[in-house]
């Protein structure tokens, strides 16, 4: 069906759309960033091109402090100070919706202003959910390159010992685990499995307070597709700054009215883009400029650029389904 109208036939009010979009988007971002304790960061910035690159210095592999005797003249050995380049990749998104003009008129609502505000808020929710899914898919895909950070085989739920082991994959940096992100199915399994465990007893009474079933690590329950592993699920122990999603372009909104339809249909198209970065990994630019979520979830799309595994974004435990 051809569209015969033009932009001027239906007006999107910038004030209503943008106020609803950015107010809701800011609320979503603030809540999510706080809830993950800085593990998954969503932010905004303007970035040109397909890739965002940054250079960082690697931690020295050997000691830089050496003892010496000032009375002996010896040859000095210099340690190599190396840097690495991390690449964030830009992904593009769009969304298209339509609604009859009469649907608003019958409620005595202004279709222009009401639709602008409604779609602005819905767009913010859509951007946030897609950003979280894409970012988490990228992190979980990248970490598959390092088997030491992948625990479990999908045959059981994580016990206290498994949760403790996941933390101490980071050795003396175990406190870097900021939160656990898990599917509700896995969360139910953890509680079912550990509900009879006693962390402390006082006069015969069991004391279990706070986040006892995850050893006091904050747990976020989110039924995200990225946490599904076939018929089973993944449980992500995320460190601070595990991933960053930068909303790197202004959200564009385009409108039109389909006059070939009876009744007339309001059509609305939204386009946006953001850059995805994973801690300790660099996107392989040979995989292309327009990666899909499936490409980002593939471990071959990411190259480890840090030499210390304690700088990797997460530990994953593969759990069975309830």
Language-model segment annotations:
Residues 184-187, 204-267:
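Extended serine/threonine-enriched, polar tracts that run as long, contiguous segments within proteins
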Residues 141-220:
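Extended, solvent-exposed, turn-rich assembly/linker loops in the middle of proteins
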Residues 1-32, 248-252, 256-322:
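Protruding loop/beta-arch "assembly-hinge" segments enriched in small, turn-prone residues
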Residues 3-8, 145-153, 243-244:
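Extended alpha-helical solenoid/rod scaffold regions
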Residues 65-66, 189-192, 230, 277:
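Short helix/loop capping segments that flank catalytic or ligand/cofactor-binding pockets
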Residues 103-173, 289-322:
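Alpha-helical scaffold segments that mediate packing/assembly in large oligomeric complexes
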Residues 1-88, 231, 306-322:
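N-terminal "assembly arms/tails" that initiate or stabilize quaternary assembly
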Residues 82-147, 180, 257-280:
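Long, contiguous amphipathic alpha-helices that act as assembly "spine/axial" helices in icosahedral shell
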């Amino acid at each position: 069906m051809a569209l015969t109208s033009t932009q001027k036939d239906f007006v999107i009010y910038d004030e209503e759309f943008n106020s609803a979009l950015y107010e809701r988007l800011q609320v979503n971002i603030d809540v999510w960033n706080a809830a993950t304790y800085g593990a998954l960061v969503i932010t905004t910035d303007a970035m040109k091109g397909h890739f965002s690159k940054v250079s960082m210095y690697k931690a020295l592999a050997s000691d830089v402090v050496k003892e010496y005797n000032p009375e002996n003249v010896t040859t000095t050995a210099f340690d190599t100070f190396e840097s690495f380049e991390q690449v964030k990749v830009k992904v593009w998104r769009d969304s298209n919706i339509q609604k009859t003009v009469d649907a608003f008129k019958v409620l005595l609502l202004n279709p222009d202003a009401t639709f602008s505000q409604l779609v602005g808020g819905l767009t913010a929710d859509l951007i946030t959910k897609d950003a979280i899914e894409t970012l988490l898919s990228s992190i979980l895909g990248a970490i598959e390159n390092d088997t030491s950070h992948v625990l479990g085989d999908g045959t059981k739920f994580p016990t206290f010992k498994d949760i403790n082991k996941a933390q101490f994959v980071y050795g003396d940096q175990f406190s870097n685990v900021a939160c656990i992100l898990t599917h509700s199915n896995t969360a139910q399994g953890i509680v079912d499995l550990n509900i009879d465990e006693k962390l402390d007893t006082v006069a015969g009474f069991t004391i279990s307070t706070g986040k006892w079933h995850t050893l006091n690590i904050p747990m976020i329950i989110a039924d995200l597709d990225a946490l599904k592993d076939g018929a089973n699920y993944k449980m992500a122990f995320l460190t601070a700054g595990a991933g960053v999603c930068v909303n790197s372009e202004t959200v564009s909104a385009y409108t039109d009215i389909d006059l070939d339809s009876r009744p007339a249909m309001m059509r609305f198209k939204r386009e946006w883009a953001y850059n995805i970065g994973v801690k300790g990994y660099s996107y392989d630019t040979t995989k292309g400029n327009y990666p899909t979520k499936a490409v980002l979830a593939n471990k071959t799309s990411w190259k480890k650029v840090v030499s210390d595994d304690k700088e990797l974004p997460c530990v994953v435990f593969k759990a069975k389904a309830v």
